[in-house]
From Swiss-Prot:
GO cellular component, one term: cytoplasm
One Pfam short name: PRK
Substrates-to-products reaction catalysed: (R)-pantothenate + ATP = (R)-4'-phosphopantothenate + ADP + H(+)
UniProt keywords, alphabetically: ATP-binding, Coenzyme A biosynthesis, Cytoplasm, Kinase, Nucleotide-binding, Transferase
Protein name: Pantothenate kinase
NCBIfam families: panK_bact
Organism: Clavibacter sepedonicus
InterPro entries, alphabetized: P-loop_NTPase, PanK, PRK/URK
Subcellular localization, as worded in the UniProt entry: Cytoplasm
Amino acid sequence: MADTATGSPTSHGHVSPFVEIARADWAALAPATHLPLRETELVQLRGIGDRLDMREVEDVYLPLSRLLNLYVTGTKKLHRDTSAFLGERAKSTPFIIGVAGSVAVGKSTVARLLREMLARWDDTPRVELVTTDGFLHPNAELERRGLMERKGFPESYDRRALLRFVTQVKSGVPEVRAPFYSHLAYDIVPGAEVVVRQPDVLIIEGLNVLQPAASGAKLAVSDLFDFSIYVDARTHDIAQWYEERFLSLQRGAFSNPRSYFHRYAELSPAEAVARARGIWSAINEPNLEQNIRPTRSRATLVLRKDADHSVANVLLRKL
């Protein structure tokens, strides 16, 4: 018996806000015209450990990009009609997509791929991607608050700054700036910024983008999304992917003397596995279970992955 994104059964008379679509049925929804995407581009978009291939793109992400294109077109028309009804001049505002999910689940790859595919549709040539990493408090501030071991948890972010950024973009501000985060330094880079200039589509990717409003706040970042995606998988599969990614980084990026995690570069294979599992158990799994997965039911669409990273089925919120 299949489960919905809320964890409730989809059969035996139970009501769900989602319709569950098997991969084969979803793939059949792909438009006849293929969007141009070369294998060399796919290699650049693929995350560490992700097994994304052209078959996956055609079966899963081509139909998704078409669905998003329909949502963009429909939202623009509704905006124009509403402006006409109010007797106002229609002002174009970006269509905002949120992409959420656990560490190592592949949400960054999904976000990058959608950025490239949506930019190939005629009516959305300007697509920007911003990750919420830039809205983490700097390490010095996290240390001051005793939150370094909870980096990635909701309280480690400057949620007001993120909300202000998305509000300004959605309001049509010509140029909006966000802090820049370095994964090498594992910190915000002072003076460096990401600049967003009125895109057709803005993708916001991060662990907690579907979180409800913070205590005392009237608005959540997700309230400003036109569409949201949750990348889902079984916990034990994500844990395995995280371990594989950690080992890959240990052999690669961690060997850079400037890497924040350079101290892990000389670990033995057994020590590296133990360290990866320790980080997962102490930080990433609790964050997934306490904060990230509970937001799954807030998404417009859920991509549910199997152990090999391929999407097995899609859950789409009923209109």
